[in-house]
Amino acid sequence: MDYSFDTTAEDPWVRISDCIKNLFSPIMTENHSHMPLQPNVSLSEGDGTQGHPDGTPPKLETANGTPKVYRPADSSTVKKGPPVAPKPAWFRQSLKGLRNRASDPRRLPDPALSVQPVPASREHPGPHTQASSIKQRISSFETFGSSQRLDKGAQRLSLQLSSGEAAKPVGKHEGGRLPGLLGRGAVPTLAPQETEQVLPSGSPAASEATDPGVSESPPPGRQPSEKTLPPSPDPLLRLLPTQTEESQGPVLKMPSQRARSFPLTRSQSCETKLLDEKTSKLYSISSQVSSAVMKSLLCLPSSISWGQAPCIPKEGASPTSLSNEDSAANGCAETSGSDTGFSLNLSELREYTEGLTEAKEADDGDHSSPQSGQSVISLLSSEELKQLIEEVKDLDEATLKQLDSIHVTILHKEEGAGLGFSLAGGADLENKVITVHRVFPNGLASQEGTIQKGNEVLSINGKSLKGTTHNDALAILRQAREPRQAVIVTRKLTPETVPDLNSSTDSAASASAASDVSVDSTAEATVCTVTLEKMSGGLGFSLEGGKGSLQGDKPLTINRIFKGAASEQSETVQPGDEILHLAGTAMQGLTRFEAWNIIKALPDGPVTIVIKRKSMQSKGTSAAGDS
């Protein structure tokens, strides 16, 4: 067509004001004046879509008359007015979209639209279009574009269902949801993550996918929103057993893993590195007995018989912390006269393997009942007992004789109470063997009677002390405060093998000995009590070491003595002395800053200090020695 008359819409010799030019632009003038020609042009150049006078709103994507409204804006040579206020971003994008879509007036329609049985009308209603504004055109364009997308989706779905391709997941991007089961075995098409959640659920719809009453098509009228699949028995039957097996696999393995969560031979890897093979076997057997007894006390169902157990725990605890154990200590029938605990000599295990019906009492355990050995053995499960019997049978006579000196002591106590003894030695000290440093007079160990000073401690609550450092051993001893039961395996050392108990530079006494201010004189170290005068300048000495120091966790020691101080004149303290207690406060585990805060908080006057000095004689206040 000829659009030459479009360029004469405005007289270039007549000046029009800016306001009028903005209100009545050439685009709008040409739009209103020549718009009645557009329906005729579209009808004459259409592709057989005439005969729709019902005024159906056109789809602007395939309309042929739309570009003719905006084309003169690009090709006209009229003078343009000054710039006006910028239009919003959405307005410019919408106009640009209209121009891009209208660049080719004779472009072919979409392939999806060409197969529609009833094509949509492309006729423009003349009067309505003339009266419409640009914003109305934009809103109608967005509305028609969205409705056309829905029609396209519906058409694709109908074509795929009619061609027999509905077995594949159709409309994956359309986000179909399942409003309800359409058939007894119908499986809806969902997103991949939703399909994985539906299949392993074991629902009757998934298990009966081969039922002949499956609905193969959704109800009419709801086709775009509901999509179902015909039954495909083979993939479902293949997926469902695999999902079921995967879900049931961990469940079946959990009991065995929980049953073995407390290893029987926990310290076996450590014992294999020992130089003496016989000693290694003794450590292994004692550690097995200790861990097996502690495990049985924590998890009673693993024992052989409920009725033979000496005490029934109410709560289980993890094998590492052992902090939540709660048992009926007063109900134990194995204690004789008191419920503090009992001990078992490992020689009774040997006699039990030989077929004796009654266990033999320990040589130094006259306080224990004759049934204590049988009671402890009854705590072990059949597998643990069988393994112990096999290991005992493999021992030679010399090693079997050493079993007489190994005792398993079970203490019943209150929660949070100490065991009544302290430890000495460690792998990081000269004395490599962990031994009992002291048994407190009124403690549980003293009341039970089996644990003596100088005995080697093999394990506490199933945790082997072989090869551990001194601090680690003290940590294991402190952890034993939490449970209401404690299983300690000790060995009575012969005089030839008794190590030097006080060769360590670290404190071996526990916090329960804080009130003890007596002098403990031994071969190399001396613990004594001194009294110093606290003045405004302090106690007259400086400290070094402490927890978290540059050299690591070290004991608090005296670094140097200040000149002119009372401590220098009296010579009661010397550099290198370790401070154990200060004014009744234990100094173990404190940093140097915390120790100085304690000293600053003391009032002026005499202060009692317990120190440990490496010397043969004590230079402090004399007191009775502790054997």
Swiss-Prot record:
Q: Which GO terms describe its molecular function?
A: CD4 receptor binding; cytokine activity
| Alphabetical UniProt keywords | Chemotaxis, Cytokine, Cytoplasm, Nucleus, Phosphoprotein, Repeat, Secreted, Transcription, Transcription regulation
* Record flagged with keyword Cell cycle: no
Q: Where is this region: Disordered?
A: 34-136, 162-267, 316-337
Q: Which residues carry this modification: Phosphoserine?
A: S217
Region (Interaction with PPP1R12A, PPP1R12B and PPP1R12C) residue ranges read 401-497
GO CC, alphabetical? cytoplasm; extracellular space; nucleus
Cross-referenced SMART domains? PDZ
- A Pfam family hit: PDZ
Q: Where is the PDZ domain?
A: 407-492, 529-614
Quote the biased-composition stretches of kind Polar residues, using this chain's numbering: 318-337
- Annotated GO biological process: induction of positive chemotaxis; leukocyte chemotaxis
What is its quaternary makeup?
Answer: Homotetramer. Pro-interleukin-16 interacts (via PDZ 2 domain) with PPP1R12A, PPP1R12B and PPP1R12C. Pro-interleukin-16 interacts with GRIN2A. Pro-interleukin-16 interacts with GABPB1. Pro-interleukin-16 interacts (via PDZ 3 domain) with HDAC3.
Q: What does this protein do?
A: Interleukin-16 stimulates a migratory response in CD4+ lymphocytes, monocytes, and eosinophils. Primes CD4+ T-cells for IL-2 and IL-15 responsiveness. Also induces T-lymphocyte expression of interleukin 2 receptor. Ligand for CD4. Pro-interleukin-16 is involved in cell cycle progression in T-cells. Appears to be involved in transcriptional regulation of SKP2 and is probably part of a transcriptional repression complex on the core promoter of the SKP2 gene. May act as a scaffold for GABPB1 (the DNA-binding subunit the GABP transcription factor complex) and HDAC3 thus maintaining transcriptional repression and blocking cell cycle progression in resting T-cells.
Q: What is this protein called?
A: Pro-interleukin-16
Q: Which gene encodes it?
A: IL16
